[in-house]
């Protein structure tokens, strides 16, 4: 009997060890996946493909911008996928992250992992992260690209860049919804000491010192701040049109949208939820028992120095933010005894004429509540193009608590924030026109059970318009538009040229004459016979000619109307196929996630898992443009062409020659008659 129990116990233990969940939980070594899905590395500048955002391909020229997309997470095994060698990367990284004892927190690279071969600039970063656990991965699902190997993890001492491979496209919004489930244990990079940083480009190096990680661990209880750098490092950066800092959210639901930002900051969802939603133009500070929003403020004047704009307010569990051109921070103290009164009024603001700041009202209780819930405040630095005309959003359903430092106080005190600093209030700002509605706010995908009710946002292409707007309030004013909830939006990359209308455009049914005159055979024969009659012939031919010209114009008009209807139909078909292609890739990503514990889709299906949805939208849009261009061509005149004698002057010349010949013949006949008369007489 004991032997039987012993054998049963061994069988149970063996079966438990073979469970996929336990294998993943205990696996901390790189796991090679069958590279049946290999593709070509996409261009790093190609952020958008047919309306949905690809994660990780946004080029970040500073380690600050890139570190916001990296995090630590336990329970997920790394996997590597091969890809075809791509082009030169603009920005690469070489990271070394250790704990306080000096132990490396990154995995040792396998033998087949080599440095990314072609890098324009390599950012070398060395620092500590006392809270990191597990493996370093990309929050938005992008890959760390090495030499012809794309890995889901960051390896120690290896130069990598960020990007996607063709068969592994990940949608940022769905990725955020999937990993925003309660209990997911993200461990964010939070550096608590001054870290070594330098760059290498063209065999030259610049040694500087500064902070590079600013993301806060969501459940930390320590006061973490980043000391200022004595020497501000100069980083090669590309100045964006809009730069904003991030804040921390402690609610279970987050998801305000910023349609104008491609390189989004990350906001931390509440206790127990480790996923971070994309950064927005809103600076949000929320309490656990009260939903409140910090509204965005315009940035300092462009002439203000970067040193003055980087003043932040570290508090308990503070989150510091850097400007894209200066990774150093200036510590300051939290505004004491300051809190604004709740505001329920709908306000109107114009960015060109900002309203005067509002004085805060002393409230010790509110300050203690903020300290207990570990709230932080940050300043939003936004540089707007003077040609832009953004609309202002309004929030009338939530209490607004504002803790901000005005630009005047900041410019005077770049390192210390005065307790008397007056915050400014601004409504949320949106930089996009209205977009198509596919799902309303609060809806979730049917295959995602147990997710929090998170807002869905597809980041549209900047500086483009959305065609085929299906919003119910298409003709409403700007103020009415601001009250509509955020919706899923797809901005397509095809925009056919729309030229002006012509005389016979065929855009509407009434443009063309409904009657089309078809001459009968008898009428044609009659016209041919009457043409020889001296008086009736020319008149009949003139009537027939006028009728033919009218019929020709109607035919041209109808052809144009047919071309316009065909172009519109092709646009609708292109839109449908684009949406189907987009959501097919989204569904594929969800399936990959659900099958992760069994090795992924490729492990289950084998080579059949590869999908290649060819994108022919550009070719279709070119054909649409060609149709519209051809149908709008107009030519005047008879269009006879030919030689010079068939032109207007040629006809007159021929008539003149005939007239001269006739006169010459008459003169010759006259002379001949006289000669015969003389001889006969």
Curated annotation (Swiss-Prot):
Residues 529-549 are annotated as: Fusion peptide. GO terms for biological process: fusion of virus membrane with host endosome membrane; symbiont entry into host cell; virion attachment to host cell. Residues 19-648 are extracellular. Coiled coil: none annotated. Residues 670-681 are cytoplasmic. Glycans are attached at residues 94, 171, 190, 202, 207, 219, 223, 310, 323, 336, 350, 360, 364, 381, 397, 475, 487, 564, 619. GO terms for cellular component: host cell plasma membrane; membrane; viral envelope; virion membrane. Residues 277-455 are annotated as: Mucin-like region. Residues 223-428 are annotated as: Disordered. A lipid is attached at residues 671, 673 (S-palmitoyl cysteine). Pfam families: Ebola-like_HR1-HR2, Filo_glycop. Residues 327-347, 395-428 have a biased composition (Low complexity). It comes from the Viruses. GP1 is responsible for binding to the receptor(s) on target cells. Interacts with CD209/DC-SIGN and CLEC4M/DC-SIGNR which act as cofactors for virus entry into the host cell. Binding to CD209 and CLEC4M, which are respectively found on dendritic cells (DCs), and on endothelial cells of liver sinusoids and lymph node sinuses, facilitate infection of macrophages and endothelial cells. These interactions not only facilitate virus cell entry, but also allow capture of viral particles by DCs and subsequent transmission to susceptible cells without DCs infection (trans infection). GP2 acts as a class I viral fusion protein. Under the current model, the protein has at least 3 conformational states: pre-fusion native state, pre-hairpin intermediate state, and post-fusion hairpin state. During viral and target cell membrane fusion, the coiled coil regions (heptad repeats) assume a trimer-of-hairpins structure, positioning the fusion peptide in close proximity to the C-terminal region of the ectodomain. The formation of this structure appears to drive apposition and subsequent fusion of viral and target cell membranes. Homotrimer; each monomer consists of a GP1 and a GP2 subunit linked by disulfide bonds. The resulting peplomers (GP1,2) protrude from the virus surface as spikes. GP1,2 interacts with human CD209 and CLEC4M (collectively referred to as DC-SIGN(R)). Asialoglycoprotein receptor (ASGP-R) may be a liver-specific receptor for GP1,2. Members of the Tyro3 receptor tyrosine kinase family may be cell entry factors interacting with GP1,2. The coiled coil regions play a role in oligomerization and fusion activity. The transmembrane domain is essential and sufficient for recruitment envelope glycoproteins into VP40-enriched multivesicular bodies. Belongs to the filoviruses glycoprotein family. This is Envelope glycoprotein. It comes from Lake Victoria marburgvirus (strain Ravn-87).
